[in-house]
A protein has these predicted regions:
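Divalent metal-coordination and catalytic microenvironments
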Residues: 16, 58, 112, 152, ...
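Functional transmembrane core segments of multi-pass inner-membrane proteins
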Residues: 122-149, 153-159, 163-164, 168-175
Length: 188
C-alpha cells in the first residue's frame, strides 16, 4: 500500500485518474490488497492539500455572504450529477466487478489523454472568470465530473476540460475543478 500512497501523492493533481491507478495496482499486485481505510486515508490527504493550497481564496469566499451564496450555488450544481450517479446507479459496481476492468480503464485513460492533448487549443480563447459561471455551466461541469466515477477518468482532468470547453479561463477552471472536488472527494 505504500507504493499506492507514493503514486497517489505524485499524480493526485495531474489530470491522471488515481482510481485508475488503484485498479491497475490491484490487478497487477493483488497481494497489496488496499482496504477502505487506505483509500479513505488517500482521500483525506487530497482534501487537506486542496484546502491548504487554496486557503486564501476559500477564506475570501467565506468572508462575504453574497460571494458565499454564489459559490455555494455553483458548487451544489457542480456536484449534483455525481451525487445522483453515485447514489442511484449500479454503473460503478458493475464496472468495478467486471472482469474487463483493465480494458475499461485503459480505454478511459486513452480517451481522456486525447482530449487533454487538444485542450490547449480551447484554453487560449477562454475569457470567462469563475464569477461569470452560470448554473447551467456548473451543472454541465458536474455531468462531466459524474463520468469520473469510472476508473481511468480523472475527476480533475474531466472537470477542467469541461470548464475550459464552456469558456472558463484555465486558472479559474482549475480552481473550480478543485473547489467542487472538495465535497466530491469528501463524499467518496
Amino acid at each position: 500500500s505504500e507504493m499506492c500512497i507514493r503514486d497517489r501523492g505524485i499524480t493526485e493533481f495531474l489530470p491522471i485518474s488515481s482510481s485508475g491507478h488503484l485498479v491497475i495496482f490491484d490487478k497487477l499486485f493483488p497481494a497489496i490488497n488496499l482496504n477502505t481505510n487506505d483509500i479513505a486515508f488517500l482521500h483525506i490527504g487530497t482534501l487537506f492539500s486542496i484546502v491548504i493550497f487554496y486557503r486564501a481564496r476559500i477564506l475570501q469566499i467565506f468572508s462575504n455572504l453574497i460571494i458565499f451564496k454564489f459559490y455555494l450555488k455553483i458548487i451544489i450544481f457542480g456536484i449534483l450529477p455525481a451525487v445522483i450517479v453515485g447514489l442511484f446507479t449500479p454503473i460503478q459496481e458493475a464496472i468495478d466487478n467486471s472482469s474487463q476492468i483493465l480494458i475499461y480503464t485503459g480505454i478511459a485513460y486513452f480517451f481522456l489523454s486525447v482530449l487533454l492533448i487538444f485542450s490547449e487549443r480551447i484554453a487560449s480563447k477562454n475569457i470567462l472568470s469563475i464569477e461569470e459561471i452560470t448554473i447551467n455551466q456548473a451543472f454541465m461541469i458536474g455531468i462531466a465530473q459524474a463520468f469520473a466515477l469510472m476508473p481511468g477518468i480523472s475527476r480533475s482532468g474531466v472537470t477542467l476540460l469541461a470548464a475550459m470547453y464552456l469558456g472558463l479561463k484555465k486558472a479559474d477552471a482549475i480552481f473550480y475543478s478543485m473547489l467542487i472536488g472538495i465535497p466530491t472527494i469528501f463524499g467518496a
